[in-house]
């Protein structure tokens, strides 16, 4: 009987962890026009958003974005200004590997990001090493979904997971300048 309870507990844990780590849903305000990364992220735009941790911590930011497309690689420079005064620059290099499929790198991404078209939205999944006070860092998984709104702005919602558990989320709107 003890073996039964161990197996049942392990199964319950696995199902709970899977539920916590699910990818973000398609934003409800999304249009029916497909988001196409190499079209919709090219040029200058501004993003306004917020990171929310399950602990209640919130961190708002604005980012100036500049994207270029050379026929194979989308380069997206992101200049962040956080509400606490911190500034940061990150640069995505997303290389098209097939129709609607990309692999990508960024300074803080561990390994390669995977991007893919999923109906009218674009999904991007990647691991990031976040700095910690002890200097060792903490690896978390981001799962982004990008969708166009009817007005042409881009909605980007992301879940942040750690060992399969959802620990935060990011929501932002990207507007053309």
Feature map (PLM): residue ranges:
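Bacterial N-terminal signal peptides that target proteins for export
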Residues: 1-9
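C-terminal motif of bacterial Sec signal peptides marking the signal peptidase cleavage site
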Residues: 16-19
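Bacterial signal peptide processing site
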Residues: 21-23
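N-terminal helix-cap/turn-to-beta initiation motif at the start of protein domains
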Residues: 28-44
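Central antiparallel beta-sheet cores of small beta-barrel/beta-sandwich binding domains
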Residues: 31, 48-133, 145
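A short, Trp-centered hydrophobic/proline-enriched beta-strand micro-motif
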Residues: 41-49, 156
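Glycine-rich, aromatic-bearing surface loops/beta-hairpins
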Residues: 143-177
């Amino acid at each position: 009987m003890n073996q039964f309870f161990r197996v049942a507990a392990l199964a319950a844990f696995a199902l709970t962890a899977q539920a916590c780590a699910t990818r973000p849903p398609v934003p409800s305000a999304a249009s029916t026009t497909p988001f196409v990364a190499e079209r919709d992220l090219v040029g200058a735009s501004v993003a306004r958003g917020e990171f929310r941790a399950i602990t209640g911590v919130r961190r708002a930011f604005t980012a100036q974005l500049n994207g270029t497309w050379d026929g194979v690689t989308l380069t997206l420079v992101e200049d962040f200004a956080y509400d606490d005064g911190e500034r940061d620059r990150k640069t995505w290099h997303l290389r098209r590997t097939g129709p609607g499929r990309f692999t990508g790198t960024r300074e803080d991404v561990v390994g390669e990001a995977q991007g893919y078209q999923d109906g009218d939205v674009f999904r991007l999944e990647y691991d990031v090493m976040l700095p910690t006070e002890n200097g060792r860092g903490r690896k978390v998984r981001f799962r982004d979904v990008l969708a166009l709104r009817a007005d042409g702005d881009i909605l980007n919602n992301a879940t942040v997971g750690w060992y399969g558990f959802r620990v935060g989320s990011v929501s932002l709107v990207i507007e053309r300048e």
